[in-house]
């Protein structure tokens, strides 16, 4: 499950995933963008590999490239989108309160992430989390929204 609950939205990096997935928009709206990888140097490329030793993915520099927008589409409630592990994409124009639920297949590939040209592997690290009490409140609010449908 993914909840976009902030008043401001940071544009996602262009990225792929380590596994195929299918997502359904439960509430809200977003734009799903698909990209092609092309020769160039404006974006730093990183491979995300799962490191068994540390128990999480790590970023490995992978040169420089360009990402060329192939298509965009606006998706709303009850719409579904699927991506194979190696498809480059991101989402944009996400409505606050958007909730998606995803089903993931088994990890099969390294993920690819494209960042600004001067990015380094450390720029790919993000610590995220939520206190258990806040998580309970968020999940209860989502449950109420689903029940009200």
Question: Which residues does each predicted region cover?
Answer:
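Short, conserved beta-strand element in jelly-roll/cupin
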Residues: 18-32, 36
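Surface loops and adjacent helix of pleckstrin homology
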Residues: 35-37, 94, 103
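Short acidic-glycine-tyrosine-enriched beta hairpin
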Residues: 36-86
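Short glycine/proline-enriched turns and hinge-like loops at secondary-structure junctions
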Residues: 14-16, 93-96
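Conserved short histidine dyad/triad with adjacent acidic residue
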Residues: 1-16, 38-39, 85
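Non-heme Fe(II)/2-oxoglutarate
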Residues: 105-149
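A short hydrophobic beta-strand segment most commonly corresponding to one strand
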Residues: 22, 96-112
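Short beta-strand His + acidic residue motifs that chelate non-heme Fe in jelly-roll/DSBH
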Residues: 32-33, 83, 88-94
